[in-house]
Curated annotation (Swiss-Prot):
Keywords: Cytoplasm, LIM domain, Metal-binding, Phosphoprotein, Transferase, Zinc, Zinc-finger. E3 ubiquitin-protein ligase that plays a key role in the ribosome quality control (RQC), a pathway that takes place when a ribosome has stalled during translation, leading to degradation of nascent peptide chains. Activated when ribosomes are stalled within an mRNA following translation of prematurely polyadenylated mRNAs. Acts as a ribosome collision sensor: specifically recognizes and binds collided ribosome and ubiquitinates the 40S ribosomal proteins rps20/uS10 and rps3/uS3. PANTHER family: E3 UBIQUITIN-PROTEIN LIGASE ZNF598, ZINC FINGER PROTEIN 598. Residues 245-315 form the LIM zinc-binding domain. This is E3 ubiquitin-protein ligase hel2. It catalyses: S-ubiquitinyl-[E2 ubiquitin-conjugating enzyme]-L-cysteine + [acceptor protein]-L-lysine = [E2 ubiquitin-conjugating enzyme]-L-cysteine + N(6)-ubiquitinyl-[acceptor protein]-L-lysine. Residues 457-468, 701-713 have a biased composition (Low complexity). Belongs to the ZNF598/HEL2 family. SUPFAM superfamilies: RING/U-box (SSF57850). Residues 366-380, 415-433, 490-501, 629-654 have a biased composition (Polar residues). GO terms for biological process: protein ubiquitination; rescue of stalled ribosome.
């Protein structure tokens, strides 16, 4: 090995380390230069191993960052409506200088019929819609502007703003790719049926406060599903709509629970006694008075006096209340002995099971006759092996004593309570057998009104009088003397004349063809007697004339007016309208094309599909609701989104119109504090007077609104006297 070997190796090692250090130094300097001063051109010469930097804006990542930054700047500069949280194209300026978008202004004035300011609740007759977002309405002479809508009280700054606003108020087809605008609801429904084979929901059309193009078209199956279960399982599930409530008696759907309860109050009967009794379902409805009578006879106590039967609803929840009513209202029907015995009340109590109470009652000494004491002693001896306390044995002895007293007094017939089980309450009178015989004699001495009318009538035969019977068709209550057979009432003669007018009109339309007239009479009578459906009857009648579209509208209207059943009238008119839609020949005349309609749907599709926008509009249109706070500069309205979260969608009621979202408006409502669930623990109820009914739905079950709420118990912790208490609810 030569002596110069190690030195050469050291030199080579030093050279390699210098090259390495120079490379790292070049990299650091290049990085620092790129941070301090960006390269703006590709013409810069770079070393072979240097990093080539692209100019700003040419790299795809840099392009994305630049576009995002520009969008954020545009979003910050864009005006946001404080009601719907959407971008403002045209501003609606009120005389109080509060502002909103022109879409919300049209919703409030055209759909909700309100001219109040959303923020200060001041009513203004005239507002201004303009493109200028910073304009002061007091600097503009509204009377000189030619573009005005006097019906809505809106003044437009230019013609284009007026056209954009009027486009929202037209009868536009809701289909996404359709640009047809119709003249009215009939033409729009006809167009949807013929062109798209879809239908509108009539309940939503009548009650829903949205623009025409914001409605939803359904197929036949989809419309049935919409009424029954709502938007579950479809694209509109975010609205939380659970279907239109249905009246089980009439088999008819209604828009919401308020409409259903209104219908039940007007068309059906309600048991007011069940509303007062604790533990029973409140708001329990019955189809008619006959079914309510059967409920009274089965579960309650009815006064059988004639005047009370004629008055109706003279029913009591307990037998003691019935006896008190008889003593107060009908004392002449009792003898002195019966009055004295009726005022005696044998108490009956419901005791807790043995061992429920910790206190021991003193054993009562027996002062009854020998046979009673014997039975009591036997009962005590039978209970001695049960290891009961002295108080429990005394309690059972007392119950045995009360039962024996009732058995003894039952022979004299003046008990106020039937010892039979309470599950099968008697519906018979509380009188004794002897009293019932006396009552029969008095009915014969004082016959009912039906018997007197039958005796005075010369044409009607005499009918034996029966005891008063509680029925909606009872002669003792609803008897109306019928006119003599030889004379006709003016109402009957007028109705017969109207029938003859319909026959004469059809004879002219059919050229007095007897076969066609017979077919017409057969179709009408079959439909009236529930033998033929409305669609088949309409189809038969339309085949009898040459031009049914022009000739039969008046005929069907007259037939509908003559039908006694309003439901049948509605079915006939709906079948006639459906026939006209299905058999429309010239469907090209329905509606006109509008090129701006598709642009309107694309621009407003997000707002129209979200229930939160309708929630805010509903809240803003409320007359008695709190006014919205005016927007301040510290609030970043661009961050407010109109898309509901999953949690809010589950709690949103049908189609999102009954509850308003308060997250964007910093407001609270009573829906933020759901009601507590009903207690399931067994309680002792003392019926002293009337009790306030608990709200449930029409059919006695838990209402849908409470089932959709969060059932978690909400408590507020408070400190009192150094202890922490939980307040579950407040009264008053």
């Amino acid at each position: 090995m030569s002596p110069s070997g190690p030195n050469l190796n050291n030199k080579e090692h030093n050279r390699a380390s210098e090259k390495k250090n120079s490379r790292t130094h070049n990299k650091k300097t290049n990085r620092n230069q790129s941070k301090e001063k960006p390269v703006s051109s590709r013409s810069v010469e770079t070393p072979k191993n240097a990093v080539c930097l692209e100019p700003v804006g040419t790299d795809p990542v840099s392009n994305v960052a630049t576009v995002d930054a520009s969008k954020e700047e545009q979003d910050e500069d864009e005006q946001i409506c404080f009601i719907c949280a959407e971008g403002i194209t045209y501003s609606c300026v009120l005389p109080c200088n509060h502002r909103m978008c022109h879409v919300c202004a049209l919703r409030l004035r055209a759909l909700y019929k309100t001219k109040e300011c959303t923020f200060c609740k001041t009513e203004w007759d005239t507002v201004l819609i303009t493109k200028d977002h910073e304009i002061d309405i007091h600097d503009v002479d509204l009377a000189k502007l030619p573009f005005q809508d006097e019906k809505l009280g809106i003044v437009y700054s230019d013609e284009h703003a007026q056209e954009e606003s009027n486009l929202l108020l037209q009868f536009n087809c809701p289909e996404d790719a359709c640009d047809i605008t119709c003249k009215g609801w009939f033409d729009l429904k006809l167009h949807a049926k013929v062109k798209h084979h879809k239908f509108f929901c009539d309940l939503c059309v009548k009650n829903k406060k949205v623009f025409t193009h914001e409605h939803t078209l359904f197929s036949k199956k989809g419309l049935t599903k919409h009424n029954e279960v709502g938007d579950q399982g479809s694209d509109l599930e975010i609205t939380g709509f659970k279907g239109h409530p249905k009246c089980e008696f009439c088999n008819t759907h209604f828009y919401d629970d308020d409409e259903l309860f209104k219908h039940c109050r007007e068309k059906h009967e309600r048991c007011y006694i069940c509303d007062q009794v604790a533990g029973r379902p409140t708001h329990q409805y019955f189809k008619n008075y006959d079914s309510l009578e059967r409920h009274f006879e089965k579960d309650h106590y009815i006064c059988r006096e004639r005047e009370c039967l004629e008055r109706k609803f003279v029913v009591f929840g307990t037998e003691i209340d019935l006896k008190a009513h008889q003593l107060d209202e009908h004392p002449h029907n009792f003898t002195q002995r019966e009055l004295r015995e009726a005022r005696r009340i044998i108490p009956q109590f419901s005791y807790d099971p043995p061992g429920a109470s910790g206190r021991n009652r003193r054993e009562r000494t027996s002062s009854t006759p020998s046979e009673q004491s014997t039975s009591v002693n036997e009962t005590a001896n039978s209970l001695s092996n049960l290891h009961l306390s002295r108080g429990e044995i005394a309690h059972l002895r007392q119950e045995e004593y009360v039962r024996e007293q009732q058995a003894r007094h039952r022979d004299f017939g003046f008990t106020l309570s039937n010892p039979a089980p309470t599950s099968a309450r008697p519906a018979t009178s509380t009188r004794t057998i002897s009293r019932g015989k006396t009552r029969t004699l008095r009915n014969e001495d004082f016959p009912s009104l039906a018997e007197v009318a039958n005796q005075n009538s010369s044409s009607a035969p005499s009918v034996p009088v029966s005891a008063p019977r509680l029925s909606g068709k009872s002669a003792s209550r609803n008897h109306v003397p019928s006119p003599p057979k030889g004379t006709k009432s003016p109402m009957a003669s007028s109705e017969q004349a109207q029938h003859q007018q319909v026959i004469d009109r059809m004879q002219k339309l059919t050229n007095y063809d007897d076969h066609k007239i017979n077919d017409f009479k057969f179709a009408v009578s079959s439909f009236r007697g529930n033998v033929m459906p409305a669609r088949e009857a309409v189809a038969r009648i339309t085949k009898l004339v040459a031009k049914p579209h022009e000739q039969l509208s008046g005929v069907f209207n007259q037939i509908a007016n003559l039908l006694e059943n309003k439901e049948k009238s509605r079915e006939l008119l709906e079948a006639w309208q459906e026939w006209k839609i299905l058999n429309a020949k010239d469907d090209t005349r329905i509606g006109t094309t509008n090129s701006n309609l598709l642009r309107l749907k694309r621009s407003n599709r997000t707002a129209a599909q979200t229930a939160s926008v309708w929630n805010r509009i509903e809240r803003a249109a409320a007359h008695d609701g709190p006014s919205l706070s005016a927007p301040s500069s510290s609030i970043n309205l661009a961050n407010i989104t109109s898309r509901p979260t999953n949690s809010s969608a589950a709690n949103t009621p049908s189609w999102g119109v009954r509850k308003a979202r308060a997250s964007a408006l910093n407001a609270r409502s009573e829906e933020d504090f759901p009601a507590l669930p009903p207690s399931t623990s067994k309680r002792i109820s003392v019926q002293l007077g009337k009790k306030q009914a608990r709200p449930v739905d029409s059919w006695g079950s838990t209402p849908n609104t409470s089932s959709n709420r969060n059932s978690n118990t909400m408590g507020v912790s408070k400190k009192k006297n150094g202890k922490k208490q939980t307040v579950l609810f407040h009264i008053g």
